[in-house]
From Swiss-Prot:
Quaternary structure and partners: Heterodimer composed of YheH and YheI.
Up-regulation conditions: Induced by several classes of structurally unrelated antibiotics, such as erythromycin, fusidic acid or linezolid.
EC number(s) from the headed UniProt entry: 7.6.2.-
Major location category of this protein: membrane
SMART domains hit by this protein: AAA
One GO CC term, this protein: plasma membrane
BP-aspect Gene Ontology terms: response to antibiotic; transmembrane transport
Keyword Transport: yes
Annotated ATP binding sites: G463, H464, T465, G466, S467, G468, K469, S470
Top-level EC class: translocase
UniProt protein name: Probable multidrug resistance ABC transporter ATP-binding/permease protein YheH
Function: Involved in the transport of four structurally unrelated drugs, including doxorubicin and mitoxantrone. Transmembrane domains (TMD) form a pore in the membrane and the ATP-binding domain (NBD) is responsible for energy generation.
Mode of membrane association: Multi-pass membrane protein
Length: 673
């Protein structure tokens, strides 16, 4: 299972949004990273540019500065070539500026004494006559720079505003695409679960499945929303910063480039430990969800049997284990986050000082203040995305583990092949041919089952608990598939039908009726838009639920909450009956359907069933044998085999297992009476 490829495949579903976001981000980063270059130009060309060579100009121009009645123009501002015989310089010494009206051979350490400017560089030293400039005179020399500085400031401000809008755009698009990816992923997971075989859920608590759909996908959402955004943003920032560093100084840029393999090695070491801890955390979190779900569902039993302490102890063990691994993860994050970033940052600045400090000792290698400013600025900016990446390592690993759990579920083979409901109603003839079945390999629960139910017949399945009654119906619905033999409907093997087609012929009523949150009507129709309100009411009337509708203020629109907890078990079963009948099935399955119904309600349903059985093949599982006396066929099962078959009179005449069960129940009834 390749987690990265699957995550990438989901991202490509919304590649237009992602590509647009990355383009916007690239433009925004480019605009923002232009700032230090603008600062460098302002420092070198305008603020410190006053120390460049000045020439006495023969004619005035717009860049000329008047000083003592003479016009001076800076070397890089000359519009026309002039004689360089008359050269002048301005030097800063401390907080003061001095004018030197002659050529200067070299630059170096500067001192001023008795109107003399002395410049020393190594063994060389030379003194020049110098005049200290007043504030007004200094301002005159800076005046030509004001326009350029204002333009650069406006450009910098404009780029910042420009960058903000593009940053907002990329952030919005990345968030939107991430939300859509997770929406799609959750839909896929939930849809896949709908198609999973019942066998999958036999050994998997519901809380664990819920945790994968909610908690794990939410962790993946953090990957796309936060981690992906941070990594893409930081990656583009780092690329832009390294490009700028190479433009400024290739040698030092290569030194800074060593940070990249350090981060890679860092991530490898981190993942080695974080992956294990996160797997434990997510697994225990699923167990906690399962435990909470189980406890809430069984709260009545827990309180009735005073099992609160034991339940709390089991929960505390899980919670303590979760706390332990969370602390281990915290220690790992503390060790490998800001501390290491600060160490790398300090090493980078040591290299910077070493490089520029060494260069300053060589007159030919003196670096401008603007370049130094830009380098320091870019180095500071470089560690912002590095810090961002490091801070997301924990979320990245958590998301990878969560993605692995979600994709593991998605890779589970489902049994619900694509198919449409049957276009024509089946006749209802059902045949089992030498069927054998085992839930666990080597432990057969059905052995060589063979029987035929003709159209419209009622077939009752009786036997002790574990004899295989429900397993026969599980095979008929294809909740499970038989290892041997075949099951046919109207002469056609059910294994040659899609499950959608097969189940469109059948309706089922279980021993424990399950109602969904919604209304009485939605529980009957299961939100099938093809079913009209009148059809819903008719189904309820057929099963004798009309008194229930009259009792409820809103009729079929009466809300149903928490599995129908406000309704009696008999009322819930009536709605379950109506649900089965509303879809007009050719085959009706009643799995202990009257077990939770009082005698009066059972009498109502029995009358209704006499009507709805007409034209339908009905399978009944019943422990109360008095309810199946009129069955056309009764199959008695024992240890997975049919040991007796026939109608009530025939089986009573045999005086076998059926006779014994019937007489036993009859005796109990008389005893109670």
């Amino acid at each position: 299972m390749k987690i990265g490829k699957t995550l990438w495949r989901y991202a490509l579903l919304y590649r237009k949004l992602l590509i647009t976001a990355v383009l916007l981000l690239t433009v925004a980063v480019g605009a923002e990273l232009t700032g230090p270059f603008i600062g460098k130009k302002m420092i070198d060309d305008h603020i410190l540019g006053i120390e460049k060579t000045w020439y006495e100009a023969a004619e005035k121009d717009k860049n000329a500065v008047q000083f003592h009645g003479v016009s001076y123009v800076r070397e890089d501002r000359l519009q026309e070539p002039v004689s360089k015989a008359k050269e002048a310089h301005i030097y800063q010494v401390g907080m003061a500026f001095y004018f030197v009206d002659q050529a200067v051979s070299f630059d170096g350490n500067r001192t001023v004494s008795d109107g003399k400017l002395t410049i020393t560089n190594g063994d060389k030293s030379r003194a020049y006559a110098a005049e200290k400039l007043t504030k007004q005179e200094l301002f005159q020399f800076y005046q030509p720079e004001i326009k350029g500085m204002v333009l650069l400031i406006c450009l910098y401000g404009g780029l910042l505003v420009f960058s903000v809008f593009f940053q907002y755009g990329q952030h919005y698009l990345l968030q939107m695409s991430a939300n859509r990816i997770i929406q799609k992923m959750r839909q896929d997971v939930f849809s896949h679960i709908q198609k999973m075989p019942i066998r999958y859920f036999d050994n998997l608590p519901a809380g664990k499945v819920v945790a994968r759909i909610t908690n794990d996908t939410e962790a993946i959402r953090d990957l796309y929303v936060t981690v992906l955004s941070t990594f893409v943003t930081s990656g583009i920032y780092m690329f832009g910063i390294f490009t700028a560093l190479f433009l400024l100084d290739v040698k030092l840029a290569f030194v800074c480039l060593a940070i990249v393999p350090i981060i890679w090695l860092w991530s490898v070491i981190y993942r080695r430990y974080a992956s294990y801890y996160n797997q434990k955390i997510r697994s225990i979190n699923s167990d906690i969800n399962a435990k909470m779900n189980e406890s809430i569902q069984g709260m009545t039993i827990i309180q009735a049997f005073r099992h609160q302490k034991e339940t709390m102890r089991e929960f505390e063990e899980l919670n303590e284990s979760h706390f332990y691994f969370q602390n281990r993860m915290l220690n790992l994050n503390s060790l490998m986050s800001h501390n290491l970033v600060n160490v790398i940052r300090n090493l980078a600045f040591v290299c910077l000082i070493w490089h520029f400090g060494g260069a300053s000792l060589n007159a030919a290698g003196i670096v401008s203040i603007g370049v130094l400013y830009a380098f320091v600025d870019y180095l500071n900016r470089l560690f912002q995305p590095i810090t961002g990446i490091v801070n997301q390592f924990s979320k990245l690993e958590l998301a990878r583990v969560s993605a692995g759990r979600v994709f593991e579920l998605l890779e589970e083979k489902n049994t619900e092949e694509a198919g449409e409901p049957a276009k024509e109603r089946a006749l209802g003839r059902v045949e089992f041919r030498d069927v054998s079945f085992a839930y666990q390999e080597g432990e057969e629960v059905l052995k060589h089952i063979s029987f035929t139910a003709q159209k419209g017949e009622t077939v009752a399945l009786v036997g002790h608990t574990g004899s295989g009654k429900s397993s026969i119906l599980n095979l008929l619905f294809r909740f499970y598939d038989a290892q041997k033999g075949d099951v046919l409907i109207d002469g056609k093997s059910i294994y040659n039908m899609s499950r959608q087609e097969l189940r469109s012929h059948m309706g089922i009523v279980l021993q424990d009726p399950y109602l969904f949150s919604g209304t009485i009507g939605s529980n009957v129709s299961l939100d099938d838009e093809r079913m009209t309100e009148e059809e819903i009411k008719n189904a309820l009337r057929q099963v004798g639920a009309e008194p229930l509708l009259k009792k409820l203020p809103k009729g079929i629109n009466e809300p149903v909450i928490e599995k129908g907890s406000t309704l009696s078990s008999g009322e819930r079963q009536l709605i379950s009956f109506a649900r089965a009948l509303a879809f007009d099935p050719a085959i009706l399955i009643l799995d202990e359907a009257t077990a939770h119904i009082d005698t009066e309600t059972e009498a109502v349903i029995q009358k209704a069933l006499d009507v709805v059985k007409q034209g339908r093949t009905t399978f009944v599982i019943a422990h109360r044998l008095s309810t199946i006396r009129n069955a056309d066929q009764i199959l008695v099962l024992d240890k997975g085999e049919i040991v007796e078959r026939g109608n009530h009179e025939e089986l009573m005449a045999l005086e076998g297992q059926y006779y014994q069960m019937y007489e036993l129940q009859k005796g109990q009834k008389h005893s109670i009476a």
